[in-house]
Amino acid sequence: MITNTILDVFARNLQELRKERGLSQEQLAARAGVHRTYIGMIERSEKNITLLNMEKIAIALNVDIIDLLKR
């Protein structure tokens, strides 16, 4: 049985990578071209992120999308 959904995994990885880079949610949102509240909702697993926005966030963090999906 899988205890964490893919949204939870993405949320955890996003928050960890963002903090490692010393970025606020607002700074990351500006780099990715999305709204700050959207980043917050993703980090709380409240939003089902699209592939296009996954790509924007990965580029903004300078990582591969797969790094955001690793369990």
Describe each region flagged by the PLM.
Residues V34-K47:
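Recognition helix of helix-turn-helix/homeodomain-like DNA-binding domains
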Residues E43, N53, L61:
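DNA major-groove recognition helix of helix-turn-helix
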Residues R12-Q27, R31:
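Short basic helix-loop element that most often maps to the first helix and adjoining turn
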Residues N62-R71:
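Short C-terminal boundary/hinge segments that cap the last helix of small helical domains
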Residues L14, L28-A29, I39-I42, L68:
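Conserved hydrophobic/aromatic packing and binding residues within compact polymer-binding modules
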Residues E46-K56:
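Short, basic-rich loop-to-helix N-cap that marks the start of a DNA-contacting helix
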Residues M1-V9:
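A detector for short, charged/polar N-terminal pre-domain segments
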